[in-house]
């Protein structure tokens, strides 16, 4: 079988001819006949995956002719299908000793794929341990062996065909054969077809593509002069021969075989090689004479053999000589050296096939030692792995089977470039395509000839035969015949290629046409192809995926073609596949017709618009009236509720409210008269000073009927309160909008006014001995009536004085604790503090009659009215714009419409954070459910268009929300009581407002609705502002469910139950889980869309889950902190890490343990379990596997390797440290699909559960995300991104140094210059980090690295540092973010050292090698590749 080719095609998907063969295998039993290196393994993998995903529970048995090939194919299957339960069954497992059915049942239990040699399966079936009915699929690698008495044919003859004849096709497995040589004659081909009950098949519709990947080598003859007959027959008739033939003991047999091998090596390679063989064999025997596992002879035989050979003379050879004459070799080997030295390929890689195992070892050693070849060729040897533990013929067997895998690996990775091997390497073994293949001995048959030739599959390669000049002619004629066959085959292929090219120039007229009536747009077959390619170019880009239409063809009996096109897997399955209807002479015409029908289907399913163009952001997704919105809007002035109240005073209906004032344990109260019922007002906490707070509670309003006299008295009382707290006389008008007074019966109000209005001279108050609790505010007339708080009287030197404290400033907002005044300390603490205590002459002062304990009401009135105004604005908003939302708690609305500029107790920033996620979630779900045909690209573009600030700004303006946004700042010093006379004649005006504020308030209201009444109320609020949003019916089945999904009992996914158990959710629609695990590169299942749509939905669901977790936390965080926390929890780094961590053990296949002493006791042992991960279940392209396995031999490092290295440090940081491990995450640089699959599974659970967020929360809790999130919240982990912190630190430092210039993070990509490519990318630190780095997309190879430079030119202008301070440079990073984080960490450390005064000009020196400043005095423990100033 052709191994997986080393060359990587530019197309990272299954080739068309491979898909043609795969689809043919689904229709019936076939034998795939394709050349070596054409990729038959891919076909087998596709067939195995299909069988597993449509499994009936039967075994898949893969038969390979040799042990190395079995091991190789099992490795390939395990790497490409990690979730499969598979194992090998080989002779080394001692299967011949498994003599009980219970042993076989235990071994095979739970397995899905078995790889073995044919003999193992034949023996098991012969003894009845494995029945043919238990097999679902039989794969025959190197199917041409299925003839005569070969075990493969015995399986078919003795078990398959009898069962087929007796029970029918349902009782036997499906057959897939793979071969590069189906036979040398038509009769042989028919025999193999009959034996395997299959039809030999080779690509027909895509033969031209197959020819592009298979290269016929040039056949060359290497002639040599044979040995003279007298030298060749030295052994015959010798004394040694007679002696050995006379005895017939086991030792004589060993010696006879040994001598025959030595003579063969002498004849083939020469005397030096024979002497080396004898010497090395004797040394090998003596060194392992008493090791049981190496030589299995009894004691006497061993002693006898050792005694003979230890006394025999051993040839002395010189292996270090530089003179070729010291290496006498045979003429045949001389011809080989001459041929090898004539090759001039600098990338030489070659194979030499020899006949005997012993000759392999000796020739390899001779080539690596001979002066002519040892410096040019790096030689290895390979004899296979069939060394049995019971082998007793060990004398002269020099090569250990344990060395074989190393030889092949060395050859694959270029550490060796020439391999000497037996025929074991001619079939299937995965080796690099060779430039030279040499048959040192003539192949024994046509199949061997073809198989050896298949190793020379590099372009312009050579296939050489070693032929004797004295050959009788028959052998040469035979190979000349074969050479002619090869030449004719090449010519036939060339003729076929020329015919196809000639047909390609034929211009067939494809007369298909489609017209869109609404626009007149026309689609024709002539331009359909470029339309289709353009559509594919607009699909979302993904690494490991090439988004382009894939065409395949079928050919009818008349040789005409019909095309089929398959679009990338991100396209809906309904339109992903299209076929032509007519038959054509040329592929060009067939492709045009298929492209026409494909594009027409895209239009019919709404994937292109009426202009027959892909939907774009500028047309379908965005309203035209939002693109022209300026950044600053002219909007309505803030709604003034006092205007409405001024008009309501004309009515006789009044309402009385009661305000309860609590201070410590003392309660007082006030009356509050309004012209209408007031909305509920939340209790207020007013901060008088650092130790004194008042709590105001409002009782419900009740209607009251007041006389004109009482209204006037309430106005007087209101004026009294307001005047009591200001030194400025009030205006004459007292028609206040709201009236305040003492909580007294109405008939006592006039008495209260008379008692408390006005003031008295301080001297008079002193004379009347007014009680201290009735003492009013002191006014210093010498200082314009400055207000003071009376403390005590002082009568010193006959002058009456007052000791007072300053009255709290009117500038202070009592709602804000940060502006608290300090309470007056104890008297013994202020004796030396004249700024606090005031001593005034009584003659300059007056004292108000209103007690100071009641004057505080005058300070409360502005605060009460300010909060009442906010409540009235919110109430009016709820009665108009939000009339359908029905908020329960008005405080949420007040918070949502209050700008930070207003400096109110709350503002919209926190609610905007919640609303943003709720909006994104709702719109994403709506788009997902209501547009089942749209791919992820359309969904993402539409989501961004609907939730962008411009759209929300337009929604706010359309609904008139601008008038209800509270921007007026409450300033107590400038505040004046609203008057009826002023408000009656107020005129409308406008104000300027940022468009972003309007958008933020919309999101804040959505957040307020979410907090007030949950998700349903929030979504009602969304529809109010964005009526185009159709709320999704999440309880209904997804509209795009495939017919497969109706069969819920069928296990469509490999090991699905195991996966569902660990996810913690059992899917009702199994295809949803398949879709969630289908990578966009998956080519073989056109009925399932890739996971991108579900990942789009899951991303929004995850945001919603984390936001709900943050909201429910007992500690309230500010908006900026919540944003950083959410980013730390849902970022792709953490999700990818948790995906890699999400592992569990799958029990390995059981293995019987045999007691080799008795060979009777069998114990079933369980090997270490196989580890499965979430990513093990990904369905992807076998032709370009995702990097899910560590291959250290390749010299490269993938994300899993880096994860294994950094995992302990990351876990320690996540569980113990106070800082988030941004640097460690960026160093892993995980591929995006690791995080994508987590989000796609969340999306799949959400859809399958009918929108149950709890089910999704259960999965992320199992994943470990909830635990990490709770620790971040509970322990206040610092989640600030290093680049943000570095920018802040640099800006602070620049400000302190008086520098105006900012700092810039400059990032560029650097390719290895040997690749001939170079890219440069400069990125500002504030740039958005996308899912993929721009330079990574389409990049190949590990040579792409990033360098980040942070210019410190601004600092160099400062005299404290001078010009010796150089820029910070970080090199060799795998991603842009990693480079910037590494540089940012150095900036943070550098700034700290600069500010501490430890780093100065005298400490700096220039690194000559790098040209970059380094700190000679600091131990900074930098990573390799990092230099710093």
UniProtKB/Swiss-Prot annotation:
Gene3D superfamilies: Dicer dimerisation domain, P-loop containing nucleotide triphosphate hydrolases, Ribonuclease III domain. Keywords: Antiviral defense, Antiviral protein, ATP-binding, Helicase, Hydrolase, Magnesium, Manganese, Metal-binding, Nucleotide-binding, Repeat, RNA-binding. It comes from Emericella nidulans (strain FGSC A4 / ATCC 38163 / CBS 112.46 / NRRL 194 / M139) (Aspergillus nidulans). One of its GO terms (cellular component) is cytoplasm. It is an enzyme of class 3 (hydrolase). The gene is dcl2. Residues 21-200 form the Helicase ATP-binding domain. The lineage of its organism: Eukaryota, Fungi, Dikarya, Ascomycota, Pezizomycotina. The record marks 1232 as: Important for activity. Its EC number is 3.1.26.-, 3.6.4.-. GO terms for molecular function: ATP binding; helicase activity; metal ion binding; ribonuclease III activity; RNA binding. This is Dicer-like protein 2. Belongs to the helicase family. Dicer subfamily.
């Amino acid at each position: 079988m052709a191994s997986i080719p080393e060359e990587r095609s530019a197309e990272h998907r299954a080739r068309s001819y491979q898909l043609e063969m795969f689809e043919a295998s689904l229709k019936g039993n076939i034998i795939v006949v394709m050349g070596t290196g054409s990729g038959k393994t891919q076909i087998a993998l596709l067939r195995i995956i299909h069988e597993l995903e449509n499994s009936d529970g039967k075994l898949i048995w893969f038969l390979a002719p040799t042990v190395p090939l079995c091991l190789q194919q099992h490795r390939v299957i395990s790497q490409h299908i990690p979730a499969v339960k598979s194992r090998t069954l080989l002779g080394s497992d001692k299967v011949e000793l498994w003599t009980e059915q219970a042993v076989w049942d235990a071994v095979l239990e739970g397995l899905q794929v078995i790889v073995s040699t044919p003999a193992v399966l034949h023996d098991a079936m012969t003894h009845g341990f494995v029945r043919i009915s238990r097999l679902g699929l039989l794969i025959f690698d190197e199917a041409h062996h299925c003839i005569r008495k070969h075990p493969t044919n015995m399986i078919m003859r003795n078990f398959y065909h009898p069962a087929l004849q007796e029970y029918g096709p349902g009782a036997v497995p499906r057959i897939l054969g793979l071969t590069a040589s189906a036979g040398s004659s038509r009769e042989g081909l028919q025999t193999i077809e009959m034996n395997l009950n299959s039809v030999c098949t080779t690509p027909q519709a895509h033969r031209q593509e197959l020819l592009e990947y298979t290269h016929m080598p040039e056949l060359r003859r290497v002639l040599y002069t044979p040995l003279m007959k007298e030298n060749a027959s030295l052994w015959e008739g010798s004394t040694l021969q007679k002696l050995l033939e006379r005895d017939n003991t086991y030792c004589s047999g060993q010696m006879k075989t040994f001598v025959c091998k030595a003579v063969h090596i002498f004849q083939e390679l020469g005397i030096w090689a024979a002497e080396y063989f004898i010497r090395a064999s004797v040394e090998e025997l003596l060194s392992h004479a008493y090791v049981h596992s190496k030589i299995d002879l009894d004691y006497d035989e061993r002693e006898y053999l050792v005694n003979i050979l230890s006394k025999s003379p051993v040839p002395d050879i010189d292996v270090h000589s530089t003179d070729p004459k010291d290496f006498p070799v045979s003429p045949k080997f001389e011809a080989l050296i001459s041929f090898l030295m004539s090759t001039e390929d600098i990338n030489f890689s070659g194979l030499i096939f020899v006949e005997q195992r012993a000759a392999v070892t000796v020739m390899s050693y001779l080539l690596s030692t001979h002066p002519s070849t040892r410096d040019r060729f790096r030689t290895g040897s390979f004899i296979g792995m069939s060394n049995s533990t019971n082998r007793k013929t060990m004398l002269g067997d020099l090569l250990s089977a344990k060395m074989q895998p190393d030889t092949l690996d060395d050859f694959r990775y270029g550490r060796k470039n020439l391999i000497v091997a037996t025929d074991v390497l001619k079939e299937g073994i995965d080796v690099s395509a060779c430039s030279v293949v040499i048959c040192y001995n003539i192949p024994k048959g046509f199949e061997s000839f073809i198989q050896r030739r298949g190793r020379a599959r590099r372009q312009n390669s050579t296939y050489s035969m070693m032929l004797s000049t004295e050959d009788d002619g028959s052998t040469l004629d035979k190979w000349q015949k074969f050479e002619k066959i090869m030449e004719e085959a090449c010519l036939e292929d060339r003729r076929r290629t020329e015919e196809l090219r000639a047909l390609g120039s034929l211009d067939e007229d494809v007369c298909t046409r489609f017209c869109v009536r609404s626009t007149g747009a026309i689609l024709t077959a002539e331009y359909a192809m470029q339309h289709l390619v353009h559509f594919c170019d607009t699909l979302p880009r993904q690494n490991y995926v090439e988004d382009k239409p894939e065409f395949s063809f079928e050919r009818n009996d008349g040789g005409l073609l019909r095309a089929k096109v398959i679009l990338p897997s991100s396209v809906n399955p309904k339109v992903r596949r299209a076929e032509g209807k007519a038959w054509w002479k040329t592929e060009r015409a067939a492709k045009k017709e298929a492209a026409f029908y494909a594009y027409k289907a895209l239009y019919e399913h709404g994937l292109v618009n009426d202009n027959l163009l892909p939907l774009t952001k500028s047309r379908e997704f965005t309203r035209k009236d939002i693109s022209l919105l300026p950044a600053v809007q002219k909007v309505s002035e803030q709604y003034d509720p006092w205007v409405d109240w001024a008009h309501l005073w004309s009515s006789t209906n009044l309402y009385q409210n009661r305000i309860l004032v609590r201070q410590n344990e003392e309660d007082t109260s006030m009356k509050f008269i309004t012209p209408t019922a007031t909305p509920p007002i939340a209790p207020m906490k007013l901060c008088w000073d650092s130790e004194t707070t008042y709590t105001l509670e409002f009782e419900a309003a009740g209607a009251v009927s007041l006389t004109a006299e009482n209204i006037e008295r309430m106005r007087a009382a209101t004026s009294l309160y307001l005047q009591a707290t200001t030194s400025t006389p009030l205006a004459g008008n007292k028609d206040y909008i709201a009236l305040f007074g003492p909580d007294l019966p109405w008939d006592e109000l006039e008495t209260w006014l008379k008692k408390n209005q006005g003031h008295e001279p301080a001297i008079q108050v002193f004379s009347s001995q007014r009680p201290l609790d009735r003492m009013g505010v002191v006014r210093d007339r010498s200082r314009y009536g400055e207000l003071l708080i009376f403390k005590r009287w002082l009568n010193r030197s006959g002058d009456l004085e007052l000791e007072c404290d300053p009255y709290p400033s009117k500038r202070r907002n009592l709602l804000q604790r940060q502006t608290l005044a300090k309470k007056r300390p104890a008297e013994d603490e202020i004796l030396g503090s004249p700024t606090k205590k005031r001593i005034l002459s009584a003659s300059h002062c007056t004292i108000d009659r209103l007690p100071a304990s009641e004057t505080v009401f005058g300070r409360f009135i502005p605060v009460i009215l300010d909060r009442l105004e906010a409540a009235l604005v919110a109430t009016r908003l709820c009665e108009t714009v939000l009339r359908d939302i029905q908020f329960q708690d008005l405080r949420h609305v007040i918070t949502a419409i209050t700008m930070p500029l207003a400096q109110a107790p709350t503002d919209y920033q926190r609610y905007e954070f919640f609303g943003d996620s709720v909006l994104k979630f709702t719109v994403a779900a709506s788009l997902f459910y209501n547009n089942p045909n749209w791919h992820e690209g359309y969904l993402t573009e539409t989501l961004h268009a609907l939730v962008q600030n411009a759209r929300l700004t337009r929604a706010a303006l359309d609904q008139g929300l601008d008038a209800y946004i509270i921007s007026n700042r409450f300033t107590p010093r400038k505040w004046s009581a609203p008057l009826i006379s002023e408000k009656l004649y107020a005129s409308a005006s406008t104000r300027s407002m940022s468009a972003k504020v309007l958008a933020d308030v919309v999101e804040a209201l959505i957040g307020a609705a979410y907090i007030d009444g949950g998700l349903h109320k929030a979504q009602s609020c969304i529809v109010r502002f964005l009526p185009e949003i159709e709320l999704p019916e999440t309880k209904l089945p997804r509209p795009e469910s495939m017919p497969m999904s109706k069969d819920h009992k069928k296990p469509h996914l490999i090991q699905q139950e195991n996966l569902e158990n660990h996810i913690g959710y059992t899917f009702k629609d199994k295809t949803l889980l398949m879709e969630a695990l289908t990578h966009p590169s998956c080519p073989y299942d056109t009925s399932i869309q890739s996971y991108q749509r579900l990942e789009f939905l899951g991303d929004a669901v995850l945001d919603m889950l984390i936001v709900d977790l943050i909201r429910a936390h007992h500690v309230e965080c500010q908006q900026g902190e919540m944003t950083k926390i959410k980013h730390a929890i849902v970022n792709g780094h953490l999700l990818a890490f948790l995906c890699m961590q999400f592992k569990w053990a799958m029990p390995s296949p059981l293995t019987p343990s045999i007691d080799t002493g008795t060979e009777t006791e069998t114990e079933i042992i369980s090997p270490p379990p196989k580890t499965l991960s979430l990513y093990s279940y990904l369905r992807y392209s076998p032709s370009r596997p995702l990097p899910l396995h560590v291959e250290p031999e390749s010299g490269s490092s993938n994300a899993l390797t880096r994860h294994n290295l950094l995992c302990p440090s990351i876990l320690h940081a996540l569980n113990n440290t106070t800082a988030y491990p941004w640097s460690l995450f960026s160093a892993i640089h995980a591929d995006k699909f690791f995080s994508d699959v987590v989000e796609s599974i969340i999306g799949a659970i959400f859809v399958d559960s009918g929108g149950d967020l709890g089910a999704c929360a259960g999965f992320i809790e199992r994943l470990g995300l909830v635990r990490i999130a709770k620790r971040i919240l509970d322990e206040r982990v610092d989640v600030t991104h290093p680049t943000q912190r570095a920018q802040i630190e640099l800006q602070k430092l620049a400000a302190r140094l008086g520098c105006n210039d900012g700092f810039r993070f400059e990032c560029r990509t650097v390719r290895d210059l040997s690749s001939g490519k170079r890219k440069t990318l400069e990125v500002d630190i504030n740039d958005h980090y996308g899912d993929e780095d721009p330079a990574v997309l389409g990049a190949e190879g590990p040579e792409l690295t990033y360098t980040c430079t942070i210019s410190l030119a601004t600092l160099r202008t400062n005299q404290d540092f001078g010009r010796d301070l150089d820029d910070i440079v970080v090199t060799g990073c795998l991603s842009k973010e990693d480079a910037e984080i590494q540089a940012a960490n150095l900036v943070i450390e550098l700034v700290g050292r600069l500010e501490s005064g430890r780093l100065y000009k005298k400490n700096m020196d220039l690194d000559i090698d790098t040209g970059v400043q380094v700190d000679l005095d600091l131990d900074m423990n930098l990573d390799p590749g990092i230099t710093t100033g």
